[in-house]
Amino acid sequence: VTFPQSLRGPFLFGAVLGLLVFTLYASVAFSGVAAWMIGLIYIAYDTLLLGFMVVSSQVAVNRQARRRALPPSPRTGPRPTVTLLVCARNERLVLPECLRALAAQTEPADEIIVLDDGSTDGTADWLVAEYAMTFEPTGTARIGRSAAWPALRIFSKPNSGKADSLNHGWRLARGEVVITLDADTVMVPGAVAAIRDGFADDPRLGIAGGVLVPICQRTASAGFFQFFQTFEYARGFLWRQVFAQYDMLVLISGAFAAYRRSVLESAGGFDVDSWVEDYELTHRIYQKSFDAGRPVTVKIIADAQGTTDAPARVTSFLNQRRRWFAGFIATHFKYHDMVANDRYGRVGRYMMCIKTLDLLLPVYALAAAVVLIMLLSIRHWLPLFIIKVIIIKLLYDLFLHAYSIFLYQRWQGIPLSRKLWLQSIGATLTEPFVFQILRQLGAVFGWLAFLRRSIDWQPQRPVATAEPMYDSPSS
């Protein structure tokens, strides 16, 4: 008897939810080690996953090193044209740095369109003055062209959201490859060339992502968030390379993403109702391409690098993670038919199952911490076995996290840094007690936002008034 495909996703989620309820019951009904069953289950899953990711990262980095060691092969075929879309709403302070980086590219984009989504901080006026823009009125929107930089255009319209702005942008685009870029993302000089090479080398490549390093504004808590997010991003992008080598990558950062225009058009563009339009689009492209019998590949391009603004305050961090997780939940439930579905290759067979577990993983982690505190404060008791497990897990994480930073540096071609290794040790030892709790809280808030079907977008930075409030990232 074949289990109905439409029920596989809900059944797996129900099983994970049922286990959560049972382990919470065990924390009050049982004694001994069984009282912290929820923590042991979480640690077991996290241990297996981390081990798999680090071993697989070693394989991915070795492959990358072998490719870099080979002499470059001559390219005889045509290379794709590139349109770069820069999304901007009240980004007057960061847009100049972004555009300077685009002008400094070793292989500039054939076309750059700044999508001004109803900015009220003078973004459009600054572009007009800085780049000698002249406008052609188009209904309520305006299209401007630069006399100083022929490749640069601006599409200025009333505020309608990022997804709608991107849809206007790619429909205006003339390039065969469309790169989407946030206005606070600063590319390294070879980033566009790396994207162009990636699409030229792989005709099946439908979506590609760059590698980003977070830069935090200058605030009282900036050092804290810069420290932890640096290692979070490094591991996260390395893990994406792992999933890409197994043909099951579903997460590409919209702050620096690239799409083959024909694939984007076939999928119908970005969903204006999604809280995470980039993540939702990747799922839809996978679904449509597999259904059509022409599955695309999704990759991370290691040499397409850049920096991006990251939250530097507790409130902005929690707002960001709440929106991300609420969007993740909504997207996963929307495409639940892909869960455990061989029709969608390894994405359906494995990745969608992993993501089903991830829906409740932060709840498991936070509940495990609460139960542990309860055992200590109410029962004044903790089995020696649990203490040993926690210590062993910290040592395990310490070694593998430090080694993953070594692998990340090799993968990115960064000179090996002893200082970074030592910092990674400090991050590993302290992250579970501070930063990880903030991440899990953001995910729980995401669940609440999803259940209420309501979430407000909040800017990470104050709207520009005069002087920048952050350290400009260097490319």
Region spans (language model):
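Membrane-embedded multi-pass helical conduit in multi-pass membrane proteins
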Residues: L24-A60, P74, K355-L451
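N-terminal signal-anchor transmembrane helix
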Residues: I41-A44, L49-A109
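Short aromatic/hydrophobic "clamp" motif used to bind/position activated sugar donors
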Residues: V178
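Active-site donor/metal-binding and catalytic loop motifs
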Residues: V296-S316
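Cell-envelope/extracellular polymer assembly enzymes that use nucleotide-activated donors
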Residues: P80-T83, E111, E265, E280
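Acidic donor-binding segment of Leloir-type glycosyltransferases
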Residues: R100-P158
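Long helical/loop segments within the catalytic core of UDP-sugar-dependent glycosyltransferases
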Residues: V59, E136-N167, R171, G175, ...
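A short, conserved alpha-helix in the catalytic core of glycosyltransferases
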Residues: V263-S266, S274-K299
